[in-house]
């Protein structure tokens, strides 16, 4: 293998990284020592365990700790570029897919749960194999792979235990579902992506013309496919590359004798799991408390995972969760009766079937919240027609900075890439996943601004959060629009028209502004 000479500039950059690492490590150690977990009740991995106390140590790092942590993680990537032999690095990245597949096997077979009861001495691979149904020598190789990237811990010859990383999956159904989300149909779609990009549909951005359709053998958009009820034979597509779930023995038919696609239930739970990882900051790094008793409409809100995050800390807010009927059925029958039945019973949270490509039936809400959905001009335009002068759309999504940087997002400290490089791998992985399954795009600030402009709206602010995922605040574009909306909403019971009893006419900031305008 050919090696390449290193320059004096390379050596200087390595020393710069070492100094930056030292400074950041000292901050991390200092912040760790200041954290106090003793006053917070230990929580389980239930869906709503993100919130409940304004002491956020168990939920979020301090801003200073967050910055130092992402700097250290970014340094690992920058240092790898400097010190790794190029051929070895290319070889390593070419094979990394199997790390994700190994994690999927461990999560799907619930190995972290098995090890949780075994304590620090763990279980032999034979014991794990007997419980999971996987041949023990093959299972050992899968677990050794994960141990090498610091997921699980090998404590002897073919003996394994949880470490602090794998223990995060212990009894954690939402996070387990998120691991499965990528490793089911999304990765099969990625198998089809290279061929798809060179096909006649490769330049398309339509949701029904993606690599995913080739993977599962359908012409439907993914949402429509997920909503299907099928025979047991159809749960695992026979005429398509996608193999389906590894184990379907737990599935039960409905009264019609057919089965819901298991990917649908997994998707709803995975959105909660992903929200817990990337979305905890959004309940704290946006000033929700200043909104009073505002109405928050979670558009395309799935089973209501984000509302479950907000509810304990901001019980004065009022919430509507909107999504497709089959998703809301799961929310109302499986999730909310367990997690927050009192919020539904007293009317603080309600559910509404809605197709977000159509005008929103909730007129003049204070906040329209969109997280983790496919944003396009049509969706934003449909919301614009429902907005009052003080309404805002909050788009919770990855705002993609690049290694070259941009004016809207503060850069990483030198000599790191402007976007923190290695630390931001996940958003780029997710971007390619969206490309594969729905032709979605994770946008840069400039791309967000252009999209919003096309919808007749404007970007008011990008809220940087203690997360890889930011919040883009969007409002009406100009005073003409705002004046038109003000006249449209005067004198109308915006929420009572929907037959939703607890909403009064033009409440909160919207009502106050309209009254002030009339008095003026």
UniProtKB/Swiss-Prot annotation:
UniProt EC number: 2.1.1.-
Residues reported to bind S-adenosyl-L-methionine: 300-301, 323, 355-356, 371
Keywords of the record: Methyltransferase, S-adenosyl-L-methionine, Transferase
Disulphide bonds in the chain: none
Keyword Transferase assigned: yes
BP terms from Gene Ontology: cichorine biosynthetic process; methylation
Pathway: Phytotoxin biosynthesis
Class of this enzyme: transferase
Matches recorded under Pfam families: Dimerisation, Methyltransf_2
Molecular function per GO: O-methyltransferase activity; protein dimerization activity
Gene3D superfamilies, alphabetized: Vaccinia Virus protein VP39, Winged helix-like DNA-binding domain superfamily/Winged helix DNA-binding domain
Phenotype on disruption: Abolishes the production of cichorine.
PROSITE patterns, per the entry: SAM_OMT_II (PS51683)
Domain of life where this protein originates: Eukaryota
Biotechnological and industrial applications of this entry: Cichorine and its derivatives are promising in the course of developing novel herbicides.
Membership in a protein family: Belongs to the class I-like SAM-binding methyltransferase superfamily. Cation-independent O-methyltransferase family.
Chain's role: O-methyltransferase; part of the gene cluster that mediates the biosynthesis of cichorine, a phytotoxin active against knapweed, corn, and soybeans. The first step in the pathway is performed by the non-reducing polyketide synthase pkbA that condenses one acetyl-CoA starter unit with 3 malonyl-CoA units. PkbA also catalyzes one methylation step to produce 3-methylorsellinate. The nonribosomal peptide synthase-like protein cicB, the cytochrome P450 monooxygenase cicH and the O-methyltransferase cicE are involved in the conversion of 3-methylorsellinate into nidulol.
Name of protein: O-methyltransferase cicE
Species annotation: Emericella nidulans (strain FGSC A4 / ATCC 38163 / CBS 112.46 / NRRL 194 / M139)
